[in-house]
Amino acid sequence: MAQNGRFSLGVRVLALLAADAEAMQTSTTLAEALGTSPVMVRRIFGALHAAGFIQQRKGPAGGAKLKKPAKEIGLGDVYAAVGSDWPQVDEKTIDTVLKRVHQDSLKAMNETTIANVAKKLKKT
């Protein structure tokens, strides 16, 4: 899955988890709601868990739920967690500029949180 697909899926998974922050949600339930494969959701779970955004439980009563409050998870954090592919070049001057642009982009993305996204989705 392309970077923007992983990012989009990560945001949507977190927004659904935020809608009922105390409940464990299975990858199958989330996949059905999002129109994707449970395998893709589980892959995203792995990245989100590694970033400390969700907690997981295996077994019949398993699933995932938010570990960190939705208002503390910025979109830039999600982008970084799911494996951001940012261009790198050998030219030091250009690479320095690209790194600054990347940092500024993540900072701007973090102005919107998963709580903001979940709230907007609830209205629709």
Kindly label every feature range from the protein language model.
Residues 90-124:
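C-terminal regulatory/oligomerization modules of transcriptional regulators
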